[in-house]
Swiss-Prot record:
It comes from the Eukaryota. The modification N-acetylserine is found at residue 2. Its EC number is 2.7.6.2. Transmembrane segments: none annotated. It comes from Saccharomyces cerevisiae (strain ATCC 204508 / S288c) (Baker's yeast). The keyword Transferase applies. Present with 3320 molecules/cell in log phase SD medium. It is an enzyme of class 2 (transferase). GO terms for molecular function: ATP binding; kinase activity; thiamine binding; thiamine diphosphokinase activity. This is Thiamine pyrophosphokinase. Belongs to the thiamine pyrophosphokinase family.
Length: 319
């Protein structure tokens, strides 16, 4: 079949009755989790660079808050020296090898009973340590019992110092039925836009979690974008028209993992059919945008990354 590229008007209606929809997602729920899901705000070790009112709202919308090692410094500094404010925004966990956590910040959060877990292994990243921890928190009563036992406080909460989190996680997954696990909405601040190798690693986690822990719904939020994975073989992205009109700009369909075929899109300014896309060839759908009145359909041969431009100063009114 020959490839096509169709330029659409700025607003079109999308009929979904004849579309083969394998997956559905709501754009706003990447930031405002569904109440039927477990949810986590993960702060990675980059400057927090979104408006404070938006940060406070996002914080309150998530069940669990986790700082990856030096990200605790970022949170501490973001709240300046306002102690009455800082005490309201204590993370549930700080985890990592703690090499980048300042002594002052460590003492502050330890004094305020934040659970701080040291993991010294250099064979996994702080991101992976955080993800294993988050899964254990929601899915392992044994882990929660360890954490709540005050007798374990002085011994790293009873968790082996090198890679205890990974050991506990691997043991848990031996009996975990993924299809019965409550989904975990995971919104990550940071991880994109700092050191390039760390940015690439962050992108790999979208693929890794989709393959190995599919109950996670990971999205990265930056001051300019939401970045997430679109599953292959037909995904419908739903959104409120006013939310789209006010908070959303351009988008890009990015074949970062591998070259693939966009079998069909419906609801983009430039829709395509049977369209090969590849970073190597330079055929990438960038600077596109949603024009479907309340949804967009994307059908690809393989999983693909989507970035969606956001206007962070407008988001607060829709959360």
């Amino acid at each position: 079949m020959s490839e096509e590229c169709i330029e659409n008007p700025e607003r079109i209606k999308i009929g979904t009755d004849l579309i083969n929809i394998r997956n559905k997602m709501n754009l706003k729920e990447l930031i405002h989790p569904n109440e039927d899901e477990n949810s986590t705000l993960l702060i990675l070790n980059q400057k927090i660079d979104i408006p404070r009112p938006l940060f406070y709202k996002i914080w309150k919308l998530h069940d669990l808050k986790v700082c990856a090692d030096g990200a605790a410094n970022r949170l501490y500094d973001y709240l300046d020296d306002d102690e009455t404010l800082r005490i309201k925004y204590l993370p549930n966990y700080i985890i990592g090898d703690l090499d980048s956590l300042s002594e002052k910040v460590y003492k502050y959060y330890r004094k305020n009973k934040v659970t701080i877990i040291k993991q010294t292994t250099q064979y996994s990243t702080d991101f992976t340590k955080c993800v294993n921890l988050i899964s254990l928190h929601f899915n392992s009563p044994e882990f929660r019992s360890l954490i709540s036992n005050k007798d374990n406080l002085q011994s790293n909460h009873g968790i082996e110092l090198e890679k205890g989190i990974h050991t506990l996680y691997n043991t848990m997954t031996e009996s975990l039925v993924f299809s019965k696990v409550t989904p975990i909405s995971l919104l990550a601040l940071g991880g994109i836009g700092g050191r390039f190798d760390q940015t690439v690693h962050s992108i790999t986690q979208l693929y890794t979690l989709s393959e190995n822990a599919s109950y996670f719904k990971l999205c990265y939020m930056t001051p300019t974008d939401l970045i997430f994975l679109i599953k292959k073989n037909g995904t419908l992205i739903e959104y409120d028209p006013q939310f789209r009109n006010t908070c959303i700009g351009n988008c890009g369909l990015l074949p970062i993992g591998e070259a693939t075929l966009v079998k069909e899109t419906r609801g983009l300014k430039w829709d395509v059919k049977n369209w090969p896309t590849s970073v190597v060839t330079g055929r990438v759908s960038s600077s596109n945008r949603f024009v479907g009145d309340n949804c967009c359909f994307i059908d690809t041969k393989d999983d693909i990354i989507l970035n969606v431009e956001i206007f962070v100063d407008k988001l607060i009114d829709f959360l």
